[in-house]
Amino acid sequence: MTYANRLTGLLAIRHPVLLAPMDRVAGGALAAAVSRAGGLGLIGGGYGDAAWLEREWAAAGNARVGCGFITWSLAAQPALLDRVLARRPAAVMLSFGDPHPFAPAIAAAGAKLICQVQTVEQAREAVAAGADILVVQGTEAGGHGLTRPLFALLPEVVDACPQVPVVAAGGIADGRGLAAALALGAEGVMMGTRFYAAQEALAHPAAKQRIVEARGADTVRSTVFDIVRGHAWPAPYTGRVLRNAFVQRWLGREDDLARNLDAIAGDYVAARDCGDFDIAAVVAGEACGLIHDIPPAAEIVERVVAQAARLRRAGDGPAPAGA
């Protein structure tokens, strides 16, 4: 079954499946694998490590991929966007900030501007700035976000911004999520946590295994890991991660953590580097309860698309569990 719609047409892809540009996890090999499977892979530009980005673009080879940035961080080093645009990306995704300053350059380079939003107001502002595609992120998503559940927010944005295709993100890990998102007016999905547990993802193997073993209820929204990593995220954003001993110790005691940071930050970095995820963060969304293996990224795309197609053919009938 084909999924020809505005999204697939704009991005010249076969399947309406996008890789979330996860910082330090969505590298070139993962992005390329998703794109070669018929979706669109986005390299995680994150906080703007130029040397890392250069390496990962090289790792993508000749695959047609895009890149995503944390907008407020990109604003502090705008020249990084020029370096990415010189690579002729299929799309650039901006999240968590004002896209207006960057939209003209992205359009001039021939890339599509994808804006991730968490409110209807942000969606309208993004369209006014020139967004070609909106990603509506629900609170179920891993990493940073706000508080609105996806399936309440999604149709609101679809109704408010009919002039652009909308992509659903947050809590989606299989074809049931894709089928449900399409039913609510989205034209595709973006998945992060599901691809975090892909063979090509740059995450530590122990972190991937934690996702496989976790349930959706094992995640929590917090600022604990932003504080210990020294990332000054603007309010009211918080980050969803798997619960572990470190977050349990400091949740609700963020001021104490900040006061003791000099004594704690070094141990956190050491834990991250050695794969101790009782201390280091595993950034994951509530979809982890639907993830039970670590397959190649192409297999994930194929499963999601095939299961959604079975659901669409079956109408209201249930589909087998799993992707």
Task: Please report, for each region that a protein language model flagged, where it lies by residue.
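Active-site entrance/lid segments in N-terminal catalytic domains of soluble metabolic enzymes
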Residues: 1-165
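Residue-level detector of alpha-helix initiation sites
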Residues: 25, 172-173
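Conserved acidic functional residues
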Residues: 116, 170-171
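Conserved active-site-proximal phosphate/metal-binding subdomains
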Residues: 149-167, 173-323
